[in-house]
Amino acid sequence: MMPSPSLTRDLLILAELERKVLWLASWTIHHANHVRENTDGLKVGGHQASSASLATIMTALYFHSLRPADRVAVKPHAAPNFHAIQYLLGRQSRDKLENFRGYKGAQSYPSRTKDADDVDFSTGSVGLGVAQTLFSSLTQDYVRAHGWGRSRPEGRMIALLGDAELDEGNIFEAILEGWKQGLRNCWWIVDYNRQSLDAVVREGLWERYQNLFRNFGWDVVVVKYGSLQQAAFAEPGGELLRQWIDRCPNQLYSALVFQGGAAWRKRLLDEIGDQGSVTQLIEQRSDKELARLMNNLGGHDLAAIIDAFDGIDHDRPVCFIAYTIKGYGLPFAEIGRAHV
């Protein structure tokens, strides 16, 4: 089935916005570290790689899925994306971006008290913003149960979180409390790039997340494959490729993303072997095309993300586990310097 012309046009527009968000966020960090005057010589930082892994998801969320009553807690390390989006929406100024992480500039992490743009939740300490969305949703239900604000539409309380934020104990306390109180209208979107400050995430962790959330009454949506990968899986030999992707360790996948198409080709052919149709699937693509296919994880595919968001037509809590690449779209994607 061919996509409708309007859908294709919308995706093209969103792709252009995604490119602008990634560029602005990366430029903001680069300017703070390498262009702006630095009198003490200290590194400013800014988490370019962590921002890049969420650029697609945040583009889909802010420019397609959000409703006026929704509120969002942005993971701290994606603050540059947030400021870039607010700039494109006319709610942030260029001088604030140029003074990112400086006095009276855009803040390192979204702040309701210090930022000029439209911050819903301060998320300066990892894990706290995530829990805030859950308790805000419970508070919304409490207020409505007492007869206040019923004329206003209900909002979804949405958290954008890094996979390593799920190491924070307060998150699990919140999940338990949500189950006790009948949590509704809460989305948690996990940026599953499988890298943290000092490590690659343990294999199979997503399955434990999935079981945990489902046991506490959440729906779980895993967004693993992008449109290119899904189309390739439908080709002869595609199922073998999908099985290889599912078996591939996180550390190896990260290394191959950085090494590029020739490395992908060698590893795939060495491990899958000459099996006719799947070999043809690989060999008919150039190195550039093969790298694009293998890097096309669900969290970087606008169509896949939008399908996941649009597919929710209920008020049950939802956890989206979106596979992403740290530093996606930047030269140092998955280079192994996990905290760059």
Short names for language-model regions:
Residues P5-L7, Y192-H339:
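Long, well-ordered, tryptophan-enriched scaffold segments
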Residues R9, I13-V21, A25, I29-T39, ...:
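Cofactor-binding active-site loop characterized by glycine-rich and histidine/acidic residues
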Residues R71-K75, N185-N193:
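Short internal beta-strands
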Residues G155, G182-C186, G217:
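Short glycine-/polar-rich loops that comprise or flank the Walker A/P-loop
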Residues L161-A164, V190-D191, A322:
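Active-site flanking residues adjacent to catalytic metal/cofactor-binding acidic residues
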